[in-house]
Amino acid sequence: MNIKKNLMKIDIQNVCKKNIFFPKKKYFFLWLKNIFKNKKIEITIRIVDMLEMKFLNKKYKKKNSLTNVLSFQSPDSIKIKHRFLNYIGDIILCAPYINKEANILKKKKIELWAHMTIHSTLHLLHYSHKDSKSKKNMQKTEIYIMKKLGYNNPYN
């Protein structure tokens, strides 16, 4: 399912069972719009089950475990400072894992989905949390975007 609004093109691929919760396409557009504003971008968001996520994590990150989200930058992705940019990368979100995590953390599912989408998108833009300075900068940006969207600080 492709969503194209103004300058953003979002390809959402859902390979999960029908009875599993994941946000409607309008939410992904809203979240990404708050990051990219009027930039021309294309992004793929793939909603997967635990089996596929574990496979992808092992194959590409060399970790034999589950995770909530993976980000894969486009080979020619650059930090967005220019007015236009095309394909920036792929985000893989594990629906059962995120939903379970929301229950454990006593957070609203939609809010955790927003945070995971924002967090992984920032990775596509070269944000990281490898050291304390970059982690602080990334978290500050995540908190700012989440609050702008009317959500709570995801780190509280």
Swiss-Prot record:
Keywords: Cytoplasm, Endonuclease, Hydrolase, Metal-binding, Nuclease, Ribosome biogenesis, rRNA processing, Zinc
Domain of life: Bacteria
Residues at which Zn(2+) binds: H119, H123, H129
Cofactor note: Binds 1 zinc ion.
UniProt main location, coarse: cytoplasm
GO cellular component: cytoplasm
Record's subcellular location: Cytoplasm
Required cofactor(s): Zn(2+)
Enzyme Commission number(s): 3.1.-.-
GO biological process entries: rRNA processing
A molecular function (GO) term: metalloendopeptidase activity
UniProt xrefs under InterPro entries: MetalPrtase_cat_dom_sf_prd, YbeY
Family classification: Belongs to the endoribonuclease YbeY family.
Cross-referenced HAMAP family: Endoribonucl_YbeY
Known role: Single strand-specific metallo-endoribonuclease involved in late-stage 70S ribosome quality control and in maturation of the 3' terminus of the 16S rRNA.
PANTHER family: ENDORIBONUCLEASE YBEY, CHLOROPLASTIC (PTHR46986:SF1)
Full protein name: Endoribonuclease YbeY
